[in-house]
UniProtKB/Swiss-Prot annotation:
This is Translation initiation factor IF-2. Residues 333-335 are annotated as: G5. Signal peptide: none annotated. The lineage of its organism: Bacteria, Bacillati, Bacillota, Bacilli, Bacillales. One of its GO terms (molecular function) is GTPase activity. Keywords: Cytoplasm, GTP-binding, Initiation factor, Nucleotide-binding, Protein biosynthesis. The gene is infB.
Amino acid sequence: MSKIRVHEYAKKHNISSKDLMTKLKEMNIEVSNHMTMLDDEVVNKLDNEYQAEKPSVADEFEVEEKVVRSKKNSNKKKKKGKGNEDKRQENFAGRQQTQTVETPDKITFSGSLTVGDLAKKLSKEPSEIIKKLFMLGIMATINQDLDKDTIELIANDYGIEVEEEVIVSETEFETFIDEQDDEENLKERPAVVTIMGHVDHGKTTLLDSIRNSKVTAGEAGGITQHIGAYQVEVNDKKITFLDTPGHAAFTTMRARGAQVTDITILVVAADDGVMPQTVEAINHAKAAGVPIIVAVNKMDKPAANPDRVMQELTEYELVPEAWGGDTIFVPISAIQGEGIDNLLEMILLVSEVEEYKANPNRYATGTVIEAQLDKGKGTIATLLVQNGTLRVGDPIVVGTTFGRVRAMVSDIGRRVKVAGPSTPVEITGLNEVPQAGDRFMAFADEKKARQIGESRAQEALLAQRGEKSKLSLEDLFQQIQEGDVKEINLIVKADVQGSVEAMAASLRKIDVEGVKVKIIHTGVGAITESDIILASASNAIVIGFNVRPDVNAKRTAELENVDIRLHRIIYKVIEEIEAAMQGMLDPEFEEKVIGQAEVRQTFKVTKVGTIAGCYVTDGKITRDSGVRIIRDGVVIYEGQLDTLKRFKDDVKEVAQNYECGITIEKYNDLKEGDIIEAYIMEEVKR
């Protein structure tokens, strides 16, 4: 005989779980609740107990007789009580029925539950739950909300498992785009590769060389068109290349929360070595957390020195495999097509190690690579499908816009009906132009896609009106206190390399309350737009030492709400960062002149002093403003207003072309012709 639970035994023998638990207690058998398992020995003992308690035939006859008599009596009472007894019996029967309802093994809830709702889910009376809460020291009514911990406490007391449902709004589909699929549904997908490097080191030549050698060779008659991405086939395996301007794939897309790249090819010219933009590219790739393969280009040139390139890159933690590191270095000549096959094989090798997989059997999700408005076709968007399969006719939501996929064109200009994971396609059918880096998701229902698209557009509009929560020194302390910041990302730019190194070394030593400083990029020269975009994507603060931001950088910083700090003394930078981390950053104020008044007449009043009868010539004079007295162009006194009146009434301000009476705090030497200049101190937005 297998084990049986207390409530199952009770149900089998038509007795309540409570009575059975009482019986077990009398038999000195310990049970914690109705879910306790009873072994064969206990079951046999119970069977014997209840067998012994069964009434004899004579007893049964007596009981039956009593029941018959009671029925007769009840019939008499029915006539007297006008059906009241019937109702009582019905209620009693109803109560008995609720007692026999089986308790569930598991309940689910979302957010919170009222006492009444919890009782219903547990198949219990609300009064019983209230009693249990009272025993736990919680005074509750039937409509009172219970939190997660209390729900779990009560349910566990009954031996019932609790599961909280987290409801995610469909408008925020980014939150479940990256949800892990079951391993059995995952299939191998092509790697997505971005090529980065310094200007004139051969990025475009390398892309052209790969495209010409692989795409056109395999697609005779196919017209290769520029859609921002393309695929090549190597050893029966595909690789997707993003043909986007330099660092855009990492910056604007990462700033918008999109991770599109799997592998970065860092192109370094063998005759030039590591240059400023090379370092920038390394920092972008590291911030995105993707593997780097170094392509040492221009090996055909006489001045080519690959060993120098390797040596320089070790300073940035890119150590070649030949030197005991884990970075793959491939010597190539993009212009002559040498080493290209080896580079592609290395990409396949990294793909194999990293095991890039996706689930093709679901609705497509992915990222916008490029988008534009065409006079003939309308909105055209290049999408990179990252998971699932996109089909012609699918309703789709892209960023804050929506539509239906009317047509899909591959990277070789052919119309296609389906696009699987890691496939770039150009689509038409969207109602507005999305932005590069926007996420997309296909839906089953066009009506739902429209609703979600419109909701997202509305939410984006509201969010735009609100403040962006980028990291700044003003709110740094608060964010540290709230536990939002564990590491402060900084970008350091200075006039000379020595200053950069000195400042970076000093900043790295700062450690306040376990929050450390991380330098994500350093450079010599003016603060550029690229620095601001990296800061925005990495939520960093930009520090400038003896350098200024250029016009584009200033504009982008304002748009992206990136905090720029400019200094001329190193220890001031350190002091400011430490003060901000400790919550002691003093606000900066600047003076703003708000108005001027001319003294037309003066009056001496006992116990009051000199009252100046004035005429406001410019702006306004306010009661709480600071003032300075100017006589013949020279400031002779600076202080505060004591009173500001119009006729006999105290006023808060007097506007231009109106007369007023003014007294100055602790100053009476006012003369006709004096100018009273009013100013306020405004906090400078850093």
